[in-house]
Amino acid sequence: GSGGATNGFDATGTNNPSLFTFNNPSGVWEVVSNTNSNTLTAGTAYRLMVRGDRTINLSSNTPTPTTTILRATGSLKTGNFTPTLNQTADGYSFVGNPYQAPIDIKAVLSASSNMNPDVTYYWDPTLNTRGGFVTRDLSLNSNSVASNFNQYLQPGQAVFVKKANTNLTASMTITE
């Protein structure tokens, strides 16, 4: 990321950003510029570009991925979580699982107001050679492509959800 090690990222030749959040109200990706002063928050969905272990040649645009382990520390989230949502009709919001236990996103969407309860969009890193999106039809319990993703959002996992095609206010509460 920008500033390399000074801002809490591994230094690279370009120091291009590798950690992003999705601004749900505006529908745009935003760079996380510093992990030393910006604490990652449970429930906030992040897009992280993982290159693999530190032996990867960063001068190549297509290095072979390597296995790596990411570790998180901090306090466990307890209590209800209410994400800020995109209020545009058919607007997308990126929502993360705030807990260290799976959540049933189908049940969450069914209990939400003015959200599309039938569809979610997951990133599956095992598709193709670099990953790809999977559309999960919750009403049919099926995926758009062969993928192991289901309605249970795992700890540390995020998903795009869609607002219903309405001008009414959408709301969602994820309960523990």
Write out the residue ranges for each language-model feature.
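N-terminal exported-region signature
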Residues: 1-176
